[in-house]
């Protein structure tokens, strides 16, 4: 998606450890117009997948997921990383390791929000090693729901997440696919 690649080139910063900082439009400050365009593109790519719900993990996946939900006209469920007074029992849970934060979280989704006939689309901000997506796949398996696809705003194709999703036979749509980082620059995949 050219508009996203251009924005990454303009505002993204490559940090050590293969980390791409995009906090000025996606991970901290959010550009609503760009999120709307990302949501439209996800909706276009998954328009024939008969999606009933979108799953994501708090917090950076929420903005693109909500916009996709708006354009697909389906609800969005975000897995919580922390328990609260209102989220205590009857939960689907999975452990997820965060590459950027170097911590393991237990993500949770209230069982009331998933039904056996659901066809879900998993949306996240990044796909690198695939831990967040794997956690949502684990929850989907436990809930016995169908994962119709995975959509990510940015994927680092050189890390194992891409292969994990495609090996599982799941439709994967990345709006920007990074082949590598070279001399502090983002090199996008050409396919």
Swiss-Prot record:
Binding site for xanthine: 20, 27, 156
Positions contributing to 5-phospho-alpha-D-ribose 1-diphosphate binding: 128-132
Keywords per UniProt: Cytoplasm, Glycosyltransferase, Purine salvage, Transferase
EC number(s) reported in the record: 2.4.2.22
Enzyme class: transferase
InterPro entries xref list: PRibTrfase_dom (IPR000836), PRTase-like (IPR029057), Pur/Pyrimidine_PRTase (IPR050118), Xanthine_PRibTrfase (IPR010079)
Molecular functions per Gene Ontology: xanthine phosphoribosyltransferase activity
Domain of life: Bacteria
Entry annotated with the keyword Cytoplasm: yes
Membership in a protein family: Belongs to the purine/pyrimidine phosphoribosyltransferase family. Xpt subfamily.
Protein name stated in the entry: Xanthine phosphoribosyltransferase
The organism of origin for this protein: Levilactobacillus brevis (strain ATCC 367 / BCRC 12310 / CIP 105137 / JCM 1170 / LMG 11437 / NCIMB 947 / NCTC 947)
Encoding gene (name): xpt
């Amino acid at each position: 998606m050219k508009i996203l690649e251009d924005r990454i080139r303009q505002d993204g910063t490559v940090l050590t450890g293969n980390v791409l900082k995009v906090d000025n439009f996606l991970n901290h400050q959010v550009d609503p117009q760009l999120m709307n365009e990302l949501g439209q593109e996800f909706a276009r790519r998954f328009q024939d997948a008969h999606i009933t719900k979108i799953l994501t993990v708090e917090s950076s996946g929420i903005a693109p997921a909500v916009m996709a939900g708006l354009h697909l006209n389906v609800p969005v469920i975000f897995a919580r990383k922390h328990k609260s007074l209102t989220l205590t029992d009857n939960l689907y849970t999975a452990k997820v390791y965060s590459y950027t934060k170097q911590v393991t979280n237990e993500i949770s989704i209230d069982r009331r929000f998933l039904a056996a006939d659901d066809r879900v689309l998993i949306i996240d901000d990044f796909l690198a090693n695939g831990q967040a997506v794997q956690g949502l796949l684990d929850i989907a398996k436990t809930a016995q729901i169908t994962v119709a696809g995975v959509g990510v705003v940015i994927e680092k194709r050189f890390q194992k997440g891409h292969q994990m999703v495609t090996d599982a036979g799941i439709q994967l749509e990345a709006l920007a696919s990074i082949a590598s980082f070279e001399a502090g620059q983002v090199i996008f995949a050409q396919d």
